[in-house]
């Protein structure tokens, strides 16, 4: 009895309770070990395994697989997914576009230079003829081949007589189902007529801006308009919303040329008036500067030095354009009187009506009182370029490079 009592006392209450209530049946499965519990597949791994099996049965094959075991000892092959391929970006920064370049007759030489600067630009031709009554008879060669292409036109509005025929081409090109259209007008000719000083004055700069703002839209959207060193900064607001004006400058050409001079470390920039200073001083602010202005004495307008010291320096007068050249010559004389060692000049647009370029003579090493050491102009006005080519003190800085770059914008 004592032995039976001790045995009964050693049994746990749960065991005793179970002995009374549990029915006979199969013994429970043993608890899984820590190792087998760790190997139990996650729902994601099981799904991946089923996916791999379905792909394999369907005839497809995965790029790779890993082995996963579950508690039942079944081995599942889970695919190792290859990294996603990132598609190449089209139109990324630095990408080049092929451009078909048309031009007016005056701009043939400059257009050829632009094409020589960039292999992505192709020269195209236009037949410029006239009817017996003098009106233009124009023909765009191979017009069907420019569909879907980027097209540009290099224009020169050197006189009112050529503007109409060029506008006819400018309005026709965007309608030939081209991808985009760019008008390069290096010199905006009515820029000096931008304001009214008396009732009845007509601001022809605004008139021309309105005409160019109505260039037809191409399939790619509004046309682009490239202009170099427009005379008045507010003229950029004369253009409507249907054209995208892009204002470039010829000053980088001047800066590169100045670096090539033997006395490049002795350069001072002079501005003939406050307008020129406002327009260009930010691009030339690392140079010493002289600012001139005009003052009225009786019936005469005299150029005076407003600020700066030209003494002993090679002074370069900078402006956007020159017509008769009277102000520039007066500025040259004042700088020479105040001790400038040399005087040169730069303008982006050399207009020189009535052969006024003949007023400018080279100094021939005799000093600034006798003439200019250099007179740099760009080829924005081709008729002037033909007149002053190979004549001292003139030197041509070509816009071909900047135009080629602008066509890739």
From Swiss-Prot:
<keyword id="KW-0067">ATP-binding</keyword>
<keyword id="KW-0150">Chloroplast</keyword>
<keyword id="KW-0934">Plastid</keyword>
<dbReference type="GO" id="GO:0009507">
    <property type="term" value="C:chloroplast"/>
</dbReference>
<dbReference type="GO" id="GO:0000287">
    <property type="term" value="F:magnesium ion binding"/>
</dbReference>
<keyword id="KW-0545">Nucleotide biosynthesis</keyword>
<dbReference type="Pfam" id="PF13793">
    <property type="entry name" value="Pribosyltran_N"/>
</dbReference>
<dbReference type="Pfam" id="PF00156">
    <property type="entry name" value="Pribosyltran"/>
</dbReference>
<dbReference type="InterPro" id="IPR000836">
    <property type="entry name" value="PRibTrfase_dom"/>
</dbReference>
<keyword id="KW-0418">Kinase</keyword>
<keyword id="KW-0479">Metal-binding</keyword>
<dbReference type="GO" id="GO:0005524">
    <property type="term" value="F:ATP binding"/>
</dbReference>
<dbReference type="InterPro" id="IPR029057">
    <property type="entry name" value="PRTase-like"/>
</dbReference>
<keyword id="KW-0460">Magnesium</keyword>
<dbReference type="GO" id="GO:0004749">
    <property type="term" value="F:ribose phosphate diphosphokinase activity"/>
</dbReference>
<feature type="binding site">
    <location>
        <position position="229"/>
    </location>
    <ligand>
        <name>Mg(2+)</name>
    </ligand>
</feature>
<feature type="transit peptide" description="Chloroplast">
    <location>
        <begin position="1"/>
        <end position="44"/>
    </location>
</feature>
<dbReference type="InterPro" id="IPR029099">
    <property type="entry name" value="Pribosyltran_N"/>
</dbReference>
<dbReference type="InterPro" id="IPR005946">
    <property type="entry name" value="Rib-P_diPkinase"/>
</dbReference>
<feature type="region of interest" description="Disordered">
    <location>
        <begin position="1"/>
        <end position="43"/>
    </location>
</feature>
<dbReference type="GO" id="GO:0005737">
    <property type="term" value="C:cytoplasm"/>
</dbReference>
<protein>
    <recommendedName>
        <fullName>Ribose-phosphate pyrophosphokinase 3, chloroplastic</fullName>
        <ecNumber>2.7.6.1</ecNumber>
    </recommendedName>
</protein>
<dbReference type="GO" id="GO:0016301">
    <property type="term" value="F:kinase activity"/>
</dbReference>
<dbReference type="GO" id="GO:0002189">
    <property type="term" value="C:ribose phosphate diphosphokinase complex"/>
</dbReference>
<keyword id="KW-0547">Nucleotide-binding</keyword>
<feature type="compositionally biased region" description="Low complexity">
    <location>
        <begin position="34"/>
        <end position="43"/>
    </location>
</feature>
<keyword id="KW-0809">Transit peptide</keyword>
<feature type="binding site">
    <location>
        <position position="231"/>
    </location>
    <ligand>
        <name>Mg(2+)</name>
    </ligand>
</feature>
<keyword id="KW-0808">Transferase</keyword>
<dbReference type="GO" id="GO:0006015">
    <property type="term" value="P:5-phosphoribose 1-diphosphate biosynthetic process"/>
</dbReference>
<dbReference type="GO" id="GO:0006164">
    <property type="term" value="P:purine nucleotide biosynthetic process"/>
</dbReference>
<feature type="region of interest" description="Binding of phosphoribosylpyrophosphate">
    <location>
        <begin position="312"/>
        <end position="327"/>
    </location>
</feature>
<feature type="compositionally biased region" description="Low complexity">
    <location>
        <begin position="1"/>
        <end position="16"/>
    </location>
</feature>
<comment type="similarity">
    <text>Belongs to the ribose-phosphate pyrophosphokinase family.</text>
</comment>
């Amino acid at each position: 009895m004592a032995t039976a009592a001790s045995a009964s006392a050693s049994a746990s209450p749960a065991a005793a309770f179970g002995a009374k209530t549990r029915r006979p049946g199969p013994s429970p499965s043993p608890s899984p070990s820590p190792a087998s519990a760790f190997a139990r597949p996650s729902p994601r791994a099981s799904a991946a395994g089923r996916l791999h099996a379905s792909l394999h049965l369907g005839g497809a094959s995965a790029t790779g697989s890993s082995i996963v075991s579950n508690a039942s000892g079944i081995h599942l092959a889970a695919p190792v997914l290859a990294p996603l391929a990132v598609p190449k970006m089209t139109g990324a920064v630095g990408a080049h576009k092929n451009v078909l370049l048309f031009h007016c007759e005056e701009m043939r030489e400059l257009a050829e230079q632009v094409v020589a600067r960039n292999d992505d630009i192709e020269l195209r031709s236009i037949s410029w003829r006239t009817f017996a009554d003098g009106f233009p008879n124009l023909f765009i060669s191979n017009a069907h081949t420019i569909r879907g292409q980027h097209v540009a036109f290099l224009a020169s509005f050197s006189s009112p007589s050529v503007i109409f025929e060029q506008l006819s081409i400018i309005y026709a090109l965007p309608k030939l189902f081209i991808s985009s259209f760019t008008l390069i007008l290096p010199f905006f000719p009515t820029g000096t007529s931008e304001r009214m000083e008396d009732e009845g004055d007509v601001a022809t700069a605004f008139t021309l801006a309105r005409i160019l703002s109505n260039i037809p839209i191409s399939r790619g959207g509004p046309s682009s308009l490239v202009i170099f060193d427009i005379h008045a900064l507010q003229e950029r607001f004369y253009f409507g919303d249907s054209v995208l004006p892009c204002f470039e400058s010829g000053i980088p050409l001047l800066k590169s040329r100045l670096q090539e001079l033997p006395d490049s470390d002795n350069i001072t920039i002079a501005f003939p008036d406050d307008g020129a200073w406002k327009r260009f001083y930010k691009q030339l602010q690392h140079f010493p500067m002289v600012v001139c202005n005009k003052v009225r004495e009786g019936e005469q307008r005299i150029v005076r030095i407003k600020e700066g010291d030209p003494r002993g320096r090679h002074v370069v007068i900078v402006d956007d354009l020159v017509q008769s050249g009277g102000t520039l010559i007066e500025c040259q004389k004042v700088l020479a009187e105040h001790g400038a060692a040399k005087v040169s000049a730069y303008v982006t647009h050399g207009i020189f009506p009535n052969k006024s370029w003949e007023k400018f003579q080279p100094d021939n090493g005799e000093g600034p009182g006798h003439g200019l050491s250099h007179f740099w102009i760009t080829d924005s006005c081709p008729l002037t370029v033909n007149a002053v080519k190979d004549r001292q003190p003139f030197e041509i800085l070509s816009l071909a490079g900047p135009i080629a770059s602008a066509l890739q914008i």
